[in-house]
Amino acid sequence: LAALPAFIRKARSNGGCGDGHGNVCGFGLMHGETLVGYATSDEAYALIVDIGTTTVAALLVDTARRHVVAARGEHNAQSPYGADVISRIRHETEWEEHRNGPNPLQQAIAKQISAMLAGLLEQAGIGDVDFLSLTGNTTMMHLLCGLPGEHIGKAPFIPATLEPMRLPAADLGIASQAPAFLLPGISAYIGADIVASLLAADAHRSQPPFLLVDLGTNAET
């Protein structure tokens, strides 16, 4: 609510952003029921990233027109630290014990996302995105945030958090001035990537029974 006056003032002062009846148009970014950002142009871009254990996929999306502007997929830069989540948790745990310099796994994925974003922006001729939406399995999300993953790898498999997060992308080491939204997870081994799949499939509108299968490096059904 507090953001609405500035949004309306900016929209009306831009001219041409309205329907002639006092209504304004634009793009609003919601966090729950809170308006946390807005754009009054007819273009609003987002970087959508799925951090897979093996592959990182990124889409540059024109959210106003609802189409993909550019896409890129790369081998996960954390792969030298292990091909599976348990190996990477082991490396991260060893780093936690000694704390010799920056967290290498966190740095690897942050630098990779930054490079992918820069390449997509250059390809599309855009300066920056309006926001980033980041998803992945629970271990990948922990490694992105620099959170300890030790307890994901052993019973009773307790993550540091499964909550959604909103924070500046720069706080994650990603080269962007935009906010980053991290989708919530469900459990230690049912992550935000599954939540994204359920949302994309409109599972909440589907009649039971409903089957979702994710055949990634780590498969879930």
Where are these regions (language model features)?
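Nucleotide/phosphate-binding catalytic cleft detector across ATP-hydrolyzing
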Residues: L1-I48, T53, P102-L132, N137-L211
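Gly/Thr-rich phosphate-binding beta-strand-loop-beta motif of the actin/hexokinase/Hsp70
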Residues: G37-Q78, P209-T221
